[in-house]
């Protein structure tokens, strides 16, 4: 059986932290910034941690 390939799209979107968690970026950051407050835009710049419900599925997608 051939080796499993990692999901290339997921590999580009998620990074593993030193403690083993998965880091992601926020959505709603590509355009339409005039409708968003400065506070909302500032919060969107920060990264976020993948939730526990999605962790296992995404971990399997990016496993090499």
Swiss-Prot record:
Annotated stretches, region: Disordered: 1-42
Cystine pairings recorded for this chain: none
Pfam families documented for this protein: Ribosomal_L35p (PF01632)
Superkingdom of source: Bacteria
Any Gene Ontology CC annotation: cytosolic large ribosomal subunit
Stored InterPro entries: Ribosomal_bL35, Ribosomal_bL35-like, Ribosomal_bL35_CS, Ribosomal_bL35_sf
Biased composition (Basic residues): 1-26
Any one GO biological process: translation
UniProt keyword annotations, A-Z: Ribonucleoprotein, Ribosomal protein
A GO MF label: structural constituent of ribosome
Xref: PANTHER family: 54S RIBOSOMAL PROTEIN BL35M, LARGE RIBOSOMAL SUBUNIT PROTEIN BL35M
Similarity annotation: Belongs to the bacterial ribosomal protein bL35 family.
Name the record gives this protein: Large ribosomal subunit protein bL35
Organism: Exiguobacterium sp. (strain ATCC BAA-1283 / AT1b)
Record gene name: rpmI
